[in-house]
Amino acid sequence: MLSPKRTRFRKQHRGRLKGISSRGNRICFGRYALQTLEPAWITSRQIEAGRRAMTRNVRRGGKIWVRIFPDKPVTVRPAETRMGSGKGSPEYWVAVVKPGKILYEMGGVPENIARKAISIAASKMPIKTQFIISE
């Protein structure tokens, strides 16, 4: 699973998901890509599940690029804990994703194989996505 090696601070504010993605919204490396249509937090487990699904489907050929990285810690309080006594401890990492962001890219495979592999990865995501091809 992906997570930062070290961070400046252990805990972060939740923030809010406003607007559309201005960076990371164009295909840079491959020919085919999976693009988000909704804002969300995508966990490192979901990113890894999508990546594994794609690599299994493509097998030998092709190359896959993961364009997002989970750099936001999410804290969780223990079950049945009273209110107060500070913020919970960091439990897992998420990538903050806005509409238009590219999640995965793929190259070196025919379109039908890429479409199939990316659709399987899309089913692992908690949001609506679309398959795009670079011009």
UniProtKB/Swiss-Prot annotation:
HAMAP family: Ribosomal_uL16. GO terms for biological process: translation. GO terms for cellular component: chloroplast; chloroplast envelope; chloroplast stroma; plastid; ribonucleoprotein complex; ribosome. This is Large ribosomal subunit protein uL16c. GO terms for molecular function: mRNA binding; rRNA binding; structural constituent of ribosome. It comes from the Eukaryota. Part of the 50S ribosomal subunit. The gene is rpl16. Keywords: Chloroplast, Plastid, Ribonucleoprotein, Ribosomal protein. CDD domains: Ribosomal_L16_L10e. Gene3D superfamilies: Ribosomal protein L10e/L16 (3.90.1170.10). Belongs to the universal ribosomal protein uL16 family. The keyword Magnesium does not apply. It is found in: Plastid, Chloroplast. It comes from Arabidopsis thaliana. SUPFAM superfamilies: Ribosomal protein L16p/L10e.
